[in-house]
Design a protein with these regions (language model features):
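Flexible, glycine-rich phosphate/dinucleotide-binding loops
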Residues: 40, 76, 140
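Bacterial N-terminal signal peptides that target proteins for export
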Residues: 1-8
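Acidic-and-aromatic substrate-binding clefts and catalytic sites of carbohydrate-active enzymes
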Residues: 45, 74-78, 111
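N-terminal signal peptide c-region/cleavage motif recognized by signal peptidases
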Residues: 15-17
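Residue-identity detector for glutamine
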Residues: 19-21, 25-27, 48, 53-55, ...
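Serine-esterase "nucleophile elbow" of acetyl-processing enzymes
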Residues: 21-73, 83-91
Length: 222
């Protein structure tokens, strides 16, 4: 090709429109919240339970995430294990596991609860789903040995399965009363003395929110 031809070819190459690279859009992250009445929103108006308040909190912080409410009132760790496979649907990227409160209320052997939670986490491992374990703290109703075994199962299982861990679901609404007894703060609890009211849920969301953000980050990684 002569000098003129080369010049024309270079000019045409420079003049050709450059196609802009399409920005890579992060896909929506889907998180299932496997839990009991605390997750389901027992006793609260629609939109005031844990999952909708947490969804609003995450939306407000710019996360592209969709939460699935897989909370069933009265459920134990055994119930969670029985339904974990269908909770881990094809579109689920991450799972919050917040179970064990009803096991505690019923005095179920912590060894049984531990085995059930281990089964739930193993199912998530097999499905390639990232997990956040949210623990509960046992009061000393059943003795120190029971309390120690119950409290230890959450962090130990989370570590064994490489899951994220948040220590206490109800920690944000617990404290000392005027008599020096540890328990739930009355202004954040419904009349039944067990379940958080809407203001209590808001405090819980603020408390567990950063751990859920960490789960979203993990679950959203390719």
């Amino acid at each position: 090709m002569g000098g003129i031809g080369k010049a024309i070819a270079v000019w045409l190459a420079l003049a050709a429109p450059v196609q802009a690279q399409e920005p890579v859009q992060a896909q929506e992250v889907v998180i299932a919240a496997l839990g009991d009445s605390l997750t389901a929103g027992y006793g609260l108006p629609r939109g005031q339970g844990l999952v909708p308040q947490l969804q609003d909190w995450l939306d407000g912080r710019g996360h592209d995430v969709r939460l699935i409410n897989a909370g069933v009132s009265g459920d134990t760790t055994a119930g969670g294990l029985a339904r974990v496979d269908w909770t881990l649907g094809d579109d689920v990227d991450g799972m919050i596991v917040a179970l064990g409160g009803n096991d505690l209320l019923r005095g179920i052997d912590p060894g049984v609860s531990r085995a059930n939670l281990d089964g739930i986490l193993s199912a998530a491992d097999a499905a390639g789903v990232e997990v956040l374990v949210i623990g509960m703290r046992a009061f000393n109703n059943f003795g120190e040995e029971y309390q120690a075994a119950y409290d230890a199962m959450y962090p130990e299982l989370a570590e064994a399965h490489g899951a994220l861990f948040h220590e206490d679901f109800l920690g944000a609404i617990s404290g000392m009363d005027t008599s020096g007894q540890e328990g739930f703060l009355p202004r954040y609890i419904q009349a039944d003395g067990l379940h958080p009211n809407a203001a209590g849920v808001a405090r819980i969301v603020e408390d567990i929110g950063p751990a859920v953000e960490a789960l979203i980050q993990r679950a959203g990684q390719p």
